[in-house]
Amino acid sequence: MKASIRVKLETLVERYEEVQHLLGDPGVIGDQNKFRALSREYSQLEEVTQCFQAYEKVQEDLVAAQEMAQEDDAEMREMAQDEIKEAKEASERLTDELQVLLIPKDPNDERNCFLEIRAGAGGDEAGIFAGNLFRMYSRFAEKKGWRIEVMSSHASEQGGFKEMIAKVSGDGAYGILKFESGGHRVQRVPETESQGRVHTSACTIAVMAEIPEADLPEIKSSDLKIDTFRSSGAGGQHVNTTDSAIRITHLPTGTVVECQDERSQHKNKAKAMSVLAARIIQAEEARRAAVVSDTRRNLLGSGDRSDRIRTYNYPQSRVSDHRINLTIYRLNEVMEGDLAALIEPVVLEYQADQLAALAEQN
């Protein structure tokens, strides 16, 4: 193990012990925000600390086995060789695990997220495909034990959606789904196509981390324009006080969020504000991300909805991820929520890029 990496690990272990001590401090326990923040840091440090301690134990075992290999007794030497082999294999495995654990963590990865699906080019077929994608992600969430809740939706005339925003709640939801942001293209024969010709349509996906209330940006009420309208209508402001749908415009950025899925205007406003905050923060992070590596930008997307990341070809039962040149012929399984074969290779590529960057720093 490189000396620089060992120093980093020893520093993390020291911080782990410090946080462990702080969590028992009455002053910290009395401050719920500080206690939650330290608890989150403690859980993040615990895994790398335990892994490093296991690595150190293996190094001790290796030294002991190497000393035993110098014994006069042939049987002891043979036993020592077996232990040396096991220790070296364990050392290599733990070194790999530690390198992955040292990859800088995105603080948002463990959070819930908002999944936004918008129909793009392709007319009614794009709206139908948006509905297919929402069903696909709903099935995936179900397999992961996550909960998915519709925040806002605009149905299209022939089925599906013009736009759908859903909240996905569950451990690591954002960290897994963030790689889905970008353009999704479908190639298939629409049900309304009498000539049997393959049409190409598209949808765009945006995945935004849910921001905890304590971390929400300050949004001045003077920066907001709030309109109400009838949920069943196409929008527009009405005098009728029973109108429960909400449209919020953030004037400085021009960001617009609508929510009309709840009967309560208060609930719709609360939902819309949470999505608005996530969008504002995502836009700021996208600006900062302009300096990241090309690989990271390709995998996570630039924030531009036009970035095409995936094609779903129905005639060939093919799904292609254009970021890593991956093609699988399991379209039906994918549309039923079996996304692991698509997401995991992208995550591994992303980790490999970060490991390479870590190696350059050391």
UniProtKB/Swiss-Prot annotation:
Location of the protein in the cell: Cytoplasm
Entry similarity comment: Belongs to the prokaryotic/mitochondrial release factor family.
Protein name: Peptide chain release factor 1
HAMAP family: Rel_fac_1
Keywords annotated in UniProt: Cytoplasm, Methylation, Protein biosynthesis
Gene Ontology CC terms, in alphabetical order: cytoplasm
Origin: domain of life: Bacteria
